[in-house]
Amino acid sequence: MTRRLLWASLADQRPRRELHWLSLMPGTRVTALAAERPPGELDWLPATYRRPVRRFVEAGALAWVRELERLPPAYDWCASLELCSLVTGQVTRYARRRGLRQAVLTWENDPRQALYRLPPYRAATQAALAEADLFLCLVHAAADHLRVLGVDEARIRVVRPGTDLSLFRPAEDPVDEPVLAYVSPVALNKGVDRVLAAFALVRRRLPAARLRVLGRGPDELLVRAAAADPASGVEYLGGGDATRVAAVLREAAVFVTAPRSTWKWTEQFGLAYLEAMACGLPVVTTVCGTNAEIVVPPNERVIDDVEALAAALLRLLEDPACRRAVGTANRKYVEERHDQHVQAARMGAAFAEIEAR
């Protein structure tokens, strides 16, 4: 029998992530309540949102979806992202009133998350903690965080994310030129300022080095200013979809970011690392949150220091054999642990375990 699952998207939710993985689960038909038609094999119900402010807040969107309460109970499950998203609070009420099972997908790795203390996030969090049938954790740290919050083990499952191994694949010929790729939101919490400063140090020793930046965000002007100087070696590529991301990664020798925590966010995993590793790139980044769950040795996690970041980049840029060895190991690691179809089947198994109780 086909599982019928309703996914209520957050406002501004990014494509080809949680909803996409659910849509790949065997024996599952997903209906997405979302502002825009998502890619993939699923049904779409257009959604509009009530938003007191027009911004996305990490760990929860300050927005309510208008159409949810009017939907008939034509589903077995309803699901959403993160405990303290206001949409999750709505989904909890919807599931309770219609007798449906509820799943919450979560990356959150900090039980001291500041948003948990702020109404109305607090109400959404407490309702989901009390009533959700399944917490599908996308990192092990999220499961630890739920245990601290008192969630019983029977409702917790961990399935780490997968990626498209046919799209994110290594270049036919490894890149010999010293090209760095920063593919991430262009924001200070992702360390774009640190990367630019470290790259300036790299250029002193490797004048041929180039830094290519792909992404959008609040600090684009910083990157544009660097790229405007022909002597900087910085190229700003703007934004791009998954196909362009994969192409830019295959044209680079090393992947780099430098995240640092904020009052409401710390790095949980980092899909950009996963995609870079699938493309056979070594990764250099900073120690932040729980990114050690994906950035495993011999990739480098350094302290939040420009000189340390530059030194790690130079070690790889000046040693092509080491780069190739790390890149080959990364591809193998992702193939063995993060194939999106294998991980989607594991997600489906998590739902089935709850259904069998």
Segments (PLM) and residue ranges:
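Nucleotide-activated donor-binding/catalytic signature segment of Leloir-type glycosyltransferases, i.e.
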Residues: 223-246, 254
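Conserved acidic donor-binding segment of nucleotide-sugar-dependent glycosyltransferases
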Residues: 296-307, 315-321
